[in-house]
């Protein structure tokens, strides 16, 4: 059984001891305790985000890039930190403006708020924004299209959403990791 995200950790922790012959794979989170039938598929999102930061800084004409994260939590902070480090690696004087949408899972489901944060950043001179915010990110991408600026997507190639304004997408290839876990 594959369980994606931190919200699934508790239920897997309850079910794993009850069903010792069932294998569980947690994605993007470690279990609360060690169970022989539970493994985690973890990623180094900060590394891909570092490259996204380099890409953003390399096309920025204002030396201001932005980040919109969904829920303020360690996973999303790793995206933002890697992005900022990559941008500053390319241009030590670049300004990285970052916003988190909220502190609950609802922060991943608010495209209107994502768009508002993106417009605020664009109004401050940002010309590229990386959105690591779930569905909230679609508002960021739409705002970039509307303002004629660049956006960087996440988790899948999002170029088809707004061709011409999508600089790139930071993809972790969760599918490959899950396939490898399935074979174990």
Where are these regions (language model features)?
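A residue-level marker of the well-folded mature domains of exported/periplasmic proteins
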Residues: 1-184
